[in-house]
Amino acid sequence: MTEKEKCRQGLLYDANYDRELLAERERAKELLYDYNRLRPSQYTEKTDLLRSLLGKVGKQVIIEPPFNCDYGYNIEVGENFYANVNLVILDGAKVTIGDNAFIAPNVGIYTAGHPLDAERRNQGLEYAYPIRIGNNVWIGAHSVILPGVTIGDHVVIGAGSVVTKDIPSYSL
């Protein structure tokens, strides 16, 4: 089983030395380098680069630079999506963001995690669990969304939150 297959199954995998995963992250870094250096007025170029990088991009998508992610292809964003500056998505697993989602500055969405056992962690092993963010969600500044979390529809995540468990729809 390849490291990528292990990752997709939620198993521990080696993301540090696997050539396939390294090449895919390198591709994302190259696209992000270009994206993060575009002029503010270059809307068409930004959209084109997002469509090349991300797995799915709805209509009316704005991600303010700088933006960083691991692979890009695991990220799907719906219609009318806005993310302010310094969004970081560690997308070892799928990240699905619904329609009308708004993300404030300095938010981290992390599918990646590491073993609590130091010996395994020191081997460079990690896991990735998918994250789902529903429709009509607002995530406040400096919030962190951790692996495996589902955020329902019509949710507001307050600034500075660390989301470690599922949040039901219509919650604050």
Which residues make up each language-model segment?
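Conserved beta-strand-loop-alpha-helix hinge in the C-terminal portion
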Residues: 169-172
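Terminal amphipathic alpha-helical/low-complexity segments used for targeting or macromolecular assembly
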Residues: 1-60
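Short secondary-structure boundary/capping segments
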Residues: 4-5, 53, 123, 130, ...
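Flexible, glycine/small-residue-enriched loop-and-beta-strand segment within the central core
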Residues: 67-151
